[in-house]
Swiss-Prot record:
Gene3D superfamilies hit by this protein: Mur ligase, C-terminal domain, Mur-like, catalytic domain, NAD(P)-binding Rossmann-like Domain
Reactions it catalyzes: UDP-N-acetyl-alpha-D-muramoyl-L-alanine + D-glutamate + ATP = UDP-N-acetyl-alpha-D-muramoyl-L-alanyl-D-glutamate + ADP + phosphate + H(+)
Pathway stated in the Swiss-Prot or TrEMBL entry: Cell wall biogenesis; peptidoglycan biosynthesis
Keywords assigned by UniProt, alphabetized: ATP-binding, Cell cycle, Cell division, Cell shape, Cell wall biogenesis/degradation, Cytoplasm, Ligase, Nucleotide-binding, Peptidoglycan synthesis
NCBIfam families from the UniProt entry: murD
GO biological process: cell division; cell wall organization; peptidoglycan biosynthetic process; regulation of cell shape
GO CC terms of this entry: cytoplasm
Taxonomic lineage from the root: Bacteria, Bacillati, Bacillota, Bacilli, Lactobacillales
Protein name per UniProt: UDP-N-acetylmuramoylalanine--D-glutamate ligase
Protein species of origin: Lacticaseibacillus paracasei (strain ATCC 334 / BCRC 17002 / CCUG 31169 / CIP 107868 / KCTC 3260 / NRRL B-441) (Lactobacillus paracasei)
Root EC class: ligase
Localization: Cytoplasm
Family: Belongs to the MurCDEF family.
Length: 459
């Protein structure tokens, strides 16, 4: 880790905890900063706050008191989920206080080279593939971190200058970067998402494009050339554009050609040899291939990873086969586009579990997909009425239930051997769960309970 003296005795406010806030606070404390942590959750129920207090940091919980900013903090490290419309954040902006997110802090103290990955869908899988491929061959280590679940500030404290940080970066995180400069940036795709947080699509796209704002002509920006919008967005970057395409777009360096994954025209392997299903995963693989080829990784390492990698938890993750039904957990599908990808990934009849936070977005584009792929639906959460209407319009039976735990046995009852039982909510989890991981873990728990019941002969 760099020897950073800029933070010594600096008054820093960490706004919001969770994993990123906790690790940012610990890193700042280690660097000698005077850290105050403010989290909305009450202290008695806030294990993170209790541990930080025990470590010697000042902790204020239960609310976000705007008057706290009268103490003249020199920096705010904001939890990425807290919007800029929050009164504390707006007051900090009015005071011209620098506001950053945790990845920016990590970048400032890290000696490693960075590869940054963003996009509406496919970020985690692409990040994971890049890390696995780099570690398959190189003598130095690649560390996956960021929105993938491991805070970058945690990794930044142990990487060396010859290592690589492979960082999944959300639009929320990118809004708070200042100097973060990935040598290779990847933009997997852009669809409608998080418009409630960003206000409009233009702001969302601008947030995604911040991943390339500090790049130079010596850097690389990998983009999905199958999306016409990318061709215009590419003009905003100073980096060398490296396009990838599943549909033979002109100028793409990583392409699917006649069923083969290729780079600069050279065949690497047949896409059919990949362990993970779906056309979307071919796109993720092409993006990863482009990134690691720029780093000199050979075809053998790429083939080994793509032939063995079975998927990321909560992303069309295969769980079990129960009495002939294959069960998949796609809790990460927090929007219509991600659920569309999941529904298109299977040829078998699907019993679809869906529902979650209602962001007020149109969902009727799902109707023809339901008609084509789905035999029955089980819906829950705020969007349950919307999803039930989609089922009705598609002529598909539907049941409404409380949550994913109660949905699983209902899905089993209406399924038959040879079917797929798929959780792919098409909505965020925040109406019932703190995040999609907890929702997915509940689904896994319910599936395990169902399996035990079926195998005991009680079903």
């Amino acid at each position: 880790m760099k020897n950073i003296s800029d933070y010594r005795n600096k008054k820093v406010l960490v706004l919001g905890l969770a994993k990123s806030g906790v690790n940012a606070a610990r890193l700042l404390h280690k660097l000698g900063a005077l850290v105050t942590v403010n989290d909305k959750q009450q202290f008695d129920d806030n294990k993170d706050a209790q541990e930080l207090l025990a470590d010697g940091m000042r902790v204020i919980t239960g609310r976000h008191p705007v008057e706290l900013l009268d103490e003249h903090f020199e920096l705010m490290v904001k939890n990425p989920g807290i919007p800029y419309s929050n009164p504390m954040v707006k007051r900090a902006e009015a005071l011209h206080m620098p506001i950053i997110t945790e990845p920016e802090l990590a970048y400032q103290v890290s000696e490693a080279q960075w590869i940054g990955i963003t996009g509406t869908n496919g970020k985690t899988t692409t990040t994971t593939l890049i890390g696995l491929m780099l570690n398959q061959q190189r003598p130095h280590h690649a560390f996956d971190a960021g929105n993938i679940g491991i805070p970058v500030s945690q990794v930044a404290q142990k990487v060396g200058k010859d290592d690589t940080i492979v960082a999944e970066l959300s639009s929320f995180q990118l809004c708070g970067i200042k100097t973060l400069h990935p040598h290779i940036a990847v933009l997997t795709n852009i669809y409608e998402a998080h418009l409630d947080w960003h206000g409009n699509r233009a702001n969302y796209v601008a947030a995604k494009m911040r991943i390339t704002m500090n790049q130079t002509p010596d850097d690389y920006f990998i983009m999905n050339w199958d999306l016409p919008e990318m061709h215009e967005l590419a003009k905003q970057s100073k980096a060398q554009i490296v396009p990838f395409s599943r549909k033979n777009a002109e100028g793409a360096r990583a392409q699917l050609i006649d069923g083969w994954l290729t780079f600069d025209g050279d065949r690497i392997m047949k896409a059919s040899e990949m362990q993970i299903p779906g056309l979307h995963n071919i796109e993720n693989a092409l993006a990863a291939i482009a990134a690691v080829k720029l780093e000199g990784v050979g075809d053998d390492a790429i083939r080994e990873v793509l032939r063995t990698f079975s998927g990321v938890k909560h992303r069309i993750q295969y769980l079990e086969t129960i009495d002939g039904r294959r069960v998949y957990n796609d809790s990460k599908a927090t929007n219509v586009e991600a659920a569309t990808v999941a529904l298109n990934a299977f040829d078998q009849p699907i019993v679809w579990l869906a529902g979650g936070l209602d962001r007020g977005l149109p969902m009727d584009a799902l109707t023809p997909l339901v008609k084509k792929h789905v035999k029955s639906m089980v819906v829950f959460g705020q969007t349950a009425p919307l999803m039930a209407k989609i089922a009705k319009d598609a002529g598909v039976p539907v049941q409404t239930t409380e949550n994913v735990m109660t949905a699983v046995p209902l899905a089993y009852e209406v399924s038959r051997p040879g079917d797929v039982i798929l959780l792919s909510p098409a909505a965020a989890s925040w109406d019932q769960y703190p995040n999609f991981e907890v929702r997915g873990d509940d689904f896994i728990k319910a599936v395990n309970q169902l399996k035990a019941t079926v195998e005991s002969g009680d079903k």
